[in-house]
């Protein structure tokens, strides 16, 4: 059975099938922007209340659970080893796990399981911080394997590699933006999802210095009119690339106006309709109109905001743009003008690394202590609930079939009752 979900995106409308909307196939969900179209989601829970099941985890991670149908996929660090786990989403039981790589290391909030898997509903692909990239079918059979560091040189990020692949049509788009611990150039590549073959690889040159070339972001997909572009942030700039060739189509500088040598970027670019939102290390967050070519630093700039996030990726529905900083200070901006509608407003004082999710007219914002603040979306600041799992949490929430999936250091939680 199929039903249509109509999303207003500027003046365009897209019909989205239930299959897509009810799954969480990539890090930022079915629409690649932290939004779910689902309704009647849980607002209240605790470690004991409104929990359908929980599965013991061996370690913390920044990777988000990836969900398709009856399967949940997890990038998991277990001591020195990294595995892909496949979990039964109904029972919360481990179905299989496959070895990805040895050589796991921990660096502050980072370990080598930080990249989230991606799936098209038939196969699943997962990257590790050690550079191993593998594809599997849903039974756990390995399709292919790549060692990106062996092929193209050691990663040179100060805190280790953490970018998730972007899956679009027949390919994975993988970025390696680094410079703190290497003189090798940064690059972006397109990999055939069926064979693992590199279809193209392009250098991404910038003038960033010391740690500023390092980027822990994930590529974003920009679609407007008949145009499709891959958006990359890092190295003091944001760029748009032709997915067919990798050619750089446009570039906006200005993400590091003071040429700070420690301006690595963690929060990923956000795309909604024909606008690209590019966070940096707090300021400035830039909003850019799509369609420009060449140097669009000034020509495409719609607005700039001086209180952006460091780690959490923002979320927008095209009308309101929500920012959460690392201390739990929130802003709601007009997505078109950048004007503050509300904020600064502080939610629970803590450190925030998880990215907010927008669904069911609510914002879900989780801090590192495992407390999720649920807020009413829209032009008025209103806290609906605070829900504490009391455990170290870096992962962002995932939503599927009326349930919320939260991954902490100790457990994977399935929250609420399933709605089909």
Question: What function would you assign to each model-found segment?
Answer:
Residues 6-16:
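Bacterial N-terminal signal peptides
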Residues 1-4:
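Positively charged n-region of N-terminal signal peptides that target proteins for export
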Residues 20-420:
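Noncatalytic, solvent-exposed loop/strand surfaces
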């Amino acid at each position: 059975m199929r039903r249509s979900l109509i999303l207003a995106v500027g003046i365009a409308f897209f019909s989205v099938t239930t299959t897509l909307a009810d799954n969480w196939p990539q890090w930022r969900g079915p629409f690649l922007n932290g939004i779910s179209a689902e309704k009647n989601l849980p607002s209240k829970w605790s470690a004991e209340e409104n929990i359908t099941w929980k599965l013991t985890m061996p370690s913390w991670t920044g990777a988000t659970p990836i969900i398709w149908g009856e399967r949940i996929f997890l990038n998991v660090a277990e001591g020195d080893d990294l595995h892909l786990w496949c979990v039964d989403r109904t029972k919360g039981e481990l179905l299989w796990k496959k070895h990805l790589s040895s050589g796991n290391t921990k660096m502050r909030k980072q370990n080598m399981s930080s990249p989230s898997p991606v799936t098209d509903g038939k196969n699943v692909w997962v990257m590790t911080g050690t550079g191993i990239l593998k594809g599997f079918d849903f039974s756990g059979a390995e399709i292919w394997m790549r060692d990106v560091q062996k092929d193209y040189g050691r990663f040179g990020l100060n805190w280790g590699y953490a970018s998730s692949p972007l899956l679009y049509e027949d390919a994975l788009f993988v970025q390696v933006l680094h410079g703190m611990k290497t003189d090798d150039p940064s690059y972006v590549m397109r990999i055939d999802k069926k064979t693992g073959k590199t279809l193209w690889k392009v250098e991404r040159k910038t003038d960033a210095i010391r740690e500023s070339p390092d980027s822990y972001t994930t590529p974003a997909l920009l679609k407007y009119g008949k145009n499709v572009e891959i958006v990359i942030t890092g190295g003091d700039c944001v760029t748009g690339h032709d997915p067919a060739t990798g050619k750089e189509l446009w570039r906006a500088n200005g993400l590091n106006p003071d040429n700070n040598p420690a301006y690595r970027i963690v929060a990923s670019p956000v795309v909604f309709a024909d606008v690209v939102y590019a966070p940096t290390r707090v300021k400035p967050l830039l909003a850019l109109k799509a369609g420009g070519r060449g140097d669009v630093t000034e020509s495409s700039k719609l607005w700039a905001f001086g209180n952006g996030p460091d780690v959490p990726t923002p979320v927008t529905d095209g009308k309101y743009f929500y920012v959460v900083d690392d201390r739990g200070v929130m802003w709601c901006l007009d997505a078109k003008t950048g004007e503050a509608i509300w904020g600064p407003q502080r939610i629970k004082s803590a450190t925030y690394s998880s990215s907010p999710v927008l669904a069911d007219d609510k914002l879900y914002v989780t801090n590192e202590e495992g407390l999720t603040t649920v807020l009413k979306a829209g032009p008025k600041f209103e806290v609906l609930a605070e829900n504490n799992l009391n455990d170290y949490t870096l992962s962002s929430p995932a939503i599927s079939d009326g349930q919320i999936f939260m991954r902490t250091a100790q457990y994977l939680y399935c929250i609420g009752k399933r709605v089909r």
